[in-house]
Amino acid sequence: MQKELDEIFYDALTNDSNVTAIVPATRIFSTCIEVPPMENDNTPLPYIIITDDPFQDEQATKDELWESDWDTVQAGIEIAAASPNAVKQLRRTIRHALAQYVESMSDNERPVLRSFSNEGIAWDWTKPCYYDTLHYQCDMYFPIDDDNEQNEG
């Protein structure tokens, strides 16, 4: 079964030695792994949270009878660190790790980047910490036949 975008990002970041040298894998969280909300409040800096954002099926109109095999999917990566420079370093390291990981994937499983943006470094006085959120929008191929076979099995 093909992985979702947030799962790909989680695997990429937890398996990259440059990322885990800065942020231990135990402080890289994802929506595909249950994390009690209160645990995030006490997590030492730096940490990363990968989010599974809403997506849109790539069909011509909403009146079509069948879904397309291609979906436009989105995921976010929140970076929290003690200084703006630490956020910038992590942002560069994360982007490089994701690019390398995606390039190593097979063509059928590889997400195709559609757009990338970030919110900019901001201060959270409640933590306190600096943070930035990266937003990725990608096209991914999810064969509908595979979904039907999985539901039948």
Question: What residue spans do the PLM features occupy?
Answer:
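Oligomerization/assembly interface segments of phage tail-like spikes and tubes
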Residues: 67-85, 129-141
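Residue-level marker of positions within ordered structural domains that often coincide
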Residues: 18, 55, 82, 99, ...
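Acidic-leaning, charged glycine-interspersed low-complexity segments
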Residues: 96-153
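Extracellular/virion structural assembly segments
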Residues: 82-99
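Small/polar-rich, solvent-exposed N-terminal microdomains that initiate assembly or binding
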Residues: 1-64, 85, 148-153
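Short, charged, surface-exposed interaction patches
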Residues: 40-71, 110-130
